[in-house]
Amino acid sequence: EFMPKNNNGDIIPNAGMESWSTKSMKKIIGSTNVPYPNAVKYEDATGTDKFWDSGNNGYMTSSGTDKLCTQATYPGMVGDYCAQLAAKYAVIAFAAGNLYTGDFVMDGTVGYAQFGQPYTYSARPAALKLKYAAEIGEINRVKNDPPVSTGIDKGRIFVCIVEWSDRHAVQSGTSVDKTTFWDPETVSSLNESKIIGYGSAYITESHTGSMKDLELPIVYYEKTAPPPTGNYT
């Protein structure tokens, strides 16, 4: 078992989204700096200084100004800043606002969201606690044979404890590879190895005005597994 059995919770680097810098990304001509949710700019960062990333890139508009994840403020947040996620559409693709632990790279107009970071657990997590606000709308743009084409455009928050040899890359942009998509609620392992546990919530209603508390209990596929020691956990 994870030991000790109970503690006050492990600290997630920059979980409050207080520290931001920039990341250089190519655009149609040249490059541009996009918001990067870590204290040290991407080109200089190492280790936990590169804990978070998003799909921010230079192709979202011709000017490269529309971003999927930005530093913001909102009533009810803890601290001075938070992250704002917003869906954006450009000539090449439509992309959801996103933020995750891992890395994001572009190869031309194709993007790869690479999920996974090294993380050391001092106890078996019971849940992930967070605050959020959301403005949910109707689906009004459909492309690439989506699983749902009508109704509300739900938000999704999930956390995973994994034992992976490598990051798992999801391919999107002008070329989508559905075989790279994954959902910890429906699979307990990927090519990179096993998913030990997960917590998940769908956001189906708008909640504005002030941030709301949310707790994601961890559901364990492996109820007695020791702390993961893989390259990405």
Question: Where are these predicted regions, by residue range?
Answer:
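Aromatic (Trp/Tyr/Phe) and Gly/Pro-enriched flexible surface segments
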Residues: F2-K129, T150-E163, R167-T233
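Short amphipathic, basic-aromatic surface patches that mediate peripheral association
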Residues: Y132-V148
